[in-house]
From Swiss-Prot:
Residue ranges annotated as Cytoplasmic topological domain: 281-386
Source taxonomy: Eukaryota, Fungi, Dikarya, Ascomycota, Saccharomycotina
GO biological process, one term: protein import into peroxisome matrix, docking
Keywords (A to Z) from UniProt: Membrane, Peroxisome, Protein transport, SH3 domain, Translocation, Transmembrane, Transmembrane helix, Transport
Family, similarity comment: Belongs to the peroxin-13 family.
InterPro entries: Peroxin-13_N, Pex13, SH3-like_dom_sf, SH3_domain
Protein name listed in UniProt: Peroxisomal membrane protein PEX13
Lumenal side: 1-263
Length: 386
């Protein structure tokens, strides 16, 4: 009977022992689902309360403010690897928190901590909205080095301008030198031409002198020595007659002397001192008019302190573009500088200056204008009488 006896079943082969892990897993999943259902109403209530106290919708930004946005503000990578593809789908799948393998793939795999929601906590700073390439860190580096590169560019421009000035001076000197050489050559050619032209008259004069000697003074012209002797005799006779008439030979020369004129000296002084003064005045006037035109072109108007408006922030405002916009806290005071956009057009985004000295644009529905109290001048008179 001992050989035909049925062996006793082992403890792990019983149905109760096999069903026990399944019951534990089902109870664990039921507890987790109940916890999630209990937490959802509280989250919905919190979201409803925060929505009721949230700020109004931000007005659409003008094109002038959106033109300076950077790639750091876009949410392309967080949308792909964050809450859309790898965050929520893998978090709510059968392998998430509600199953036996919930903490392996759902929360720590692709769901919540490591790679989900902008790569989670360990890898979240890489491509999310907080650090790395997010929120203007790349543009901030570019802006910090922008002034240095502008300085280097200005230095290179100055050196290039100086080199161009030297080159233009050299070319002007070169051209003027060869121009003078060409002018000298032209004068030489003119001299040769005049010499050849007047040579004909010299030959004719020589022939007339020969004719004068051949005809014994009847034809032709007398020689030079004979003409000078005849002319000197005539001049002596004329001088003697003048001496008899006026008593002095140089009386006519004294009469013909001119008085010294001061006009050339005055014109010279006016050209030396007056012209630079007038030129300086003209340049100053041009600079003033240019500054006024530039300010009008930029849409900036002169600020009148008596007409300046003040406002108070009603809600917190976080700027998307810190270069053009300014951050606000509820209750902050500010002065409204302009109600126009950078292009000078009327806009819903106003330019303000906070108490901290920050200047930027904000939507007008986030602030409240503080009305000024009218001054009552006759009150002072009444107090004086009492």
């Amino acid at each position: 009977m001992s050989s035909t006896a049925v062996p006793r079943p082992k403890p792990w082969e019983t149905s109760a022992s096999l069903e026990e892990p399944q019951r534990n897993a089902q109870s664990l999943s039921a507890m987790m689902t109940s916890n999630q259902q209990d937490s959802r109403p509280t989250e919905e209530s919190n979201n409803s309360n925060s929505a009721s106290e949230s700020a109004p919708e931000v007005l659409p930004r003008p094109a002038a403010l959106n033109s300076s946005g950077t790639y750091g503000e876009s949410n392309t990578i967080p949308g792909i690897y964050g809450n859309s593809n790898y965050g929520i789908p893998y978090d709510n799948n059968p392998y998430s928190m509600n199953s036996i393998y919930g903490n392996s793939i759902g929360r720590y795999g692709y769901g919540g901590s490591y790679y989900g929601n902008n790569y989670g906590s360990f890898y979240g700073g890489g491509y999310g909205a907080g650090a790395g390439y997010g929120m203007n860190n790349g543009s901030g580096l570019g802006e910090s080095t922008k002034a240095t590169f502008q300085l280097i560019e200005s230095l290179i421009g100055a050196v290039t301008g100086f080199a161009q000035m030297l080159e233009s001076t050299y070319m002007a000197t070169h051209n003027s030198f060869f121009t003078m050489i060409s002018v000298a050559e032209q004068f030489g050619n003119l001299k040769e031409m005049l010499g050849s032209f007047f040579g004909i008259f010299a030959i004719m004069k020589f022939l007339k002198k020969i004719l004068y000697r051949a005809t014994k003074g009847r034809l032709g012209i007398p020689p030079k020595n004979f003409a000078e002797s005849e002319g000197s005799k005539n001049k002596l006779i004329e001088d003697f007659q003048k001496f008899n008439d006026s008593g002095t030979i140089n009386s006519n020369e004294k009469a013909t002397r001119r008085k010294i004129s001061w006009k050339p000296l005055l014109f010279f002084l006016m050209a030396v001192f007056g012209f630079p003064y007038l030129l300086n005045k003209f340049i100053t006037k041009l600079q003033t008019s240019g500054t006024i035109r530039a300010s009008q072109g930029n849409g900036s108007e002169p600020i009148d302190p008596s007409k300046l408006e003040f406002a108070r922030a009603l809600y917190d405002f976080v700027p998307e573009n810190p270069e053009m916009e300014v951050a606000l806290k509820k209750g902050d005071l500010m002065a409204i500088l302009s109600k126009k956009d950078p292009l000078g057009r009327d806009s819903d985004w106003w330019k303000v200056r906070t108490k901290n000295g920050n200047i930027g644009y904000i939507p007008y529905n986030y602030i409240e204008i503080i009305k000024r109290r009218k001054k009552i001048e006759h009150v002072d008179d009444e107090t004086r009488t009492h």
